[in-house]
UniProtKB/Swiss-Prot annotation:
Belongs to the elongation factor P family. This is Elongation factor P-like protein. It comes from Yersinia enterocolitica serotype O:8 / biotype 1B (strain NCTC 13174 / 8081). One of its GO terms (molecular function) is translation elongation factor activity. Transmembrane segments: none annotated. It holds the Pfam family EFP. Coiled coil: none annotated. It comes from the Bacteria. GO terms for cellular component: cytoplasm. One of its GO terms (biological process) is peptide biosynthetic process.
Amino acid sequence: MARANEIKRGMAVNLNGKLLLVKDIDVQSPSARGASTLYKMRFSDVRTGLKVEERFKGDEILDTITLTRRSVNFSYIDGDEYVFMDDEDFTPYNFKKEQIEEELLFIPEGGMPGMQVLTMDGQLLALELPQTVDMEIVETAPSIKGASASARNKPAVMSTGLSIQVPEYISPGEKIRIHIVERRYMGRAD
C-alpha cells in the first residue's frame, strides 16, 4: 500500500481487480488554497495491454504490487517473437512484437545496456528500458552552416524508425542521446 504521491513510473498497482503498470505520471497542483494536488497516471493493463488513465489525490491509498526485475540483453528474433536473455542465469524471455512495439523503437540493432524484464510470480509482465539511449541518425535534412545551438529544430529518423526533433546543426550519421520517456533530443552521444 502506498499513497498516490509516492507512486513512481514503473511500479505496479492493483486497481479495481486489474494489474496495472504505471507508464507516466502528471502532477497537477491547483492554485486555490486548500485544494489537493492531483496525480494523473497513465497505466498499461498487464493482461490486456490496454491503456488506462486515472486521477488520484495525493493522499489516496493505492494497492502496490511487488515486481521482480531481472537484467536482460536482446538475443534474437524468432518469427514475431523477440527473445531477451537473462544476464545472470541465461533464462530466455519471449515477447510478442505487439507487447513491446513501443519499446522496439528505442532498441538499436544489437540491443542496449540497462534493459530489465518485470515479472510477478514467474509471469512475464513487461520490458523496461533505461532513461536514455544513444542512437545514430539515418535521415535528416542537411545541417546548416552557422546554425546556433538555440536555433530551430528539424525532424530526424533513427535506424529503428523513431522520429524525433533535433537542432538544425545535427547531420545524418551522428550519434545522439535520446531521453526515452520524453522522446526528446538530449545532446550528442560521447
